[in-house]
C-alpha cells in the first residue's frame, strides 16, 4: 500500500503528539525503574516446537505443504457502465494431509455492497477504506458455480451448492477432495460494477482523454488452507490486505478497441492489439536501457495509434507462479518502456502507463526509469525479479501493489513518485515472493518493504532521493506512545490512524536497528536474504521469520522481538554517575548507567576527558540481562568531564533528559 499517506501522518504525529519523554517518578519525586530483566530476557519466547512442517531453525520442514490455485480468467469491460463481467476456471490442488468437504473463496468486491460488514465499520470521514460514500450497486453478482469433470472424454459441468457470507463464499463439494494432491476444477460466472474509488486499491480515474480503469480484486479468489489455521476466512473489511495461494494465470481481457491494456504477466498477442509501428517500438524498448516511447502524448487523439476494423479487442496475458493478478485499461494511456537487466542475465521490461495530465519531466516521464532502478537494485540485493514485466500505472489509487503491476498516484512527482514507485515494486519481495498472511501480519510485508525501500532510495541515482536521517530520540517518543497498539496486531485490530506507524515505520525501524546497532550489516543482510530464499513462494509465519534471523545470525533476539514487535515497550537509558578507582582518575573511572524502561538495547557512550580527548564505547545488550543498573571500569588516565549516552541519536531512547553526565552538574 501507499506509504506517502503514512509519511504525512507521521509529520502530523510529530507536530501534535504530546511528548512522553519524561521519566516515571513516584509520589516522593524519586525516579521509578520499570525495567524487569526477567521479563525482557525470559527464554520462554516460542510457544511451540519445530515440526515436520516448520522447523525449529526457521525453514520449511521436510513435510511442508501448501495448496495451489491456477486460474483461467476471461473478462469483458464495459467502459460506459463500468461493469466487468467474466468467467473463471479454477484448478485447485489440495496438497494438504486433510480431505476437504468444502472450500472457501474470497469475494472482495462485496466490501462495496451497501450492507456489507466493512461498510458498517467505515467512519463517515477520514478513511481510505470503502468507496468514499459512492452510491452504486457494488459487489459481485455470482451467476453460476459449476464443478467441471471429465466422464468418458466428455466434459460435464455440474452445479454445486454454495453459500455467500459477506466477502466469502463457501462451496460444498459433492464428494470430499482427496488429500495429498486431489484436484478439482470450478467454473464461476460473475460480474460487478467497478467503484470509482475502491478502498485505495482499485478504481476509475477520469482524464480528459478517457477513464483509466485500475482493476483489482476482480475475480473470486481461493482462500488459503494452511497448516496454521486451516481455512483462512477472515472477512475483507478494508484495512487488512490479502493472503493468497500461488498458481499460474491465463488471462483474456476484452475492451473497446481504442483502449490499451496493461496487466500482470506477459502479453502473448501483441500483433492483435498494437499497430505495426508500436510493435517495432516494443522491440526497440526490449533492447534499450533508456526509456522508449511506445505511444506518445501526440498520438492519443490519432485513431491510427490503435488497430482499426474492430469495436473490441481481446488482450491475452500469461503469468507463472503468482499469488494474484491485476490490470488497467484506458484510451488515455501514454505508454513507454525500457528493459530491466537481472543478475542471472535474464531480461524483463519496465513499463509505464499514464495520462497526459501525469506527463512531465519531473513526473511520470521518469516512471520507467524509477521502475527499472528499483527492481534492478532489489534483484541484485535480495532475489531476482520473477515476472516478465513491471508496469507502473498512473491511477486513482494512491499506491497499491500486485504481481508485476502497481497502481501509483497519478499526481505524484519527483521524490514522491520515486517513493511510491519504489515502495509498491518493493512489494514484489513482500508479499508477492514471500507470501505471508497480510490480513493478520501487515508488518511482515509493509514493514519489511519499507526497510528495503530505505536501502534502494539511498542507492538510487547517487542518492538523489536519499532518505534524510531522522532523530531516533524524537521517533522513540512517538512510536512508543501508549496510543499505539503493538506491532503484532492486525490492521483490523488497530486504529486506522496508527497503521502507518505500526505496519510500516516501526517494524522497518526495527530491522534497521537490528542491522545497524545489534547484529551488523553483513550478518543481518545474510540472514534477511536467507529468509527470502527459504520462504520464496511459500507462507511464513512471524515465528519462521524470527527463527531464521536468529539461526542464521547466531543471536538470541527474543528480547528484541518481545519488546519491539510483541509489546510496545519504551527505551530509556541513563548515565547516572561517574566515580574513580580509589578516587584517582589515573587508575580508571567507574561509570554507572541505568535502564529505566522495559526495552533493553546495546549501549553507546561518548566519553570526553579534561584534555579534550573524545572516545566511543559500545556495550552489548547483555549488560541488561541480569541488571537494572550497571557500573563498569573505563580505563581513564585523566578526569572525565562528560559522558553522553547515544550521542548520535541512533537508538529510540524516549527520554533524552538523562542521557548525559557532566562534571560539576
Question: Where is each model-derived feature located?
Answer:
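Hydrophobic alpha-helical and helix-loop surface patches within well-folded domains
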Residues: 21-22, 31-56, 68-69, 317, ...
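Early extracytoplasmic/domain-onset interaction patches
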Residues: 25-106
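Short, hydrophobic/aromatic-enriched beta-strand segments in well-ordered soluble domains
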Residues: 88-90, 94, 107-109, 182-196, ...
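Glycine/proline-rich low-complexity spacer/linker segments in large multi-domain proteins
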Residues: 115-132, 191-249, 270, 649-665
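Hydrophobic helix-coil surface modules that form long, contiguous segments used
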Residues: 220-229, 237-422, 451
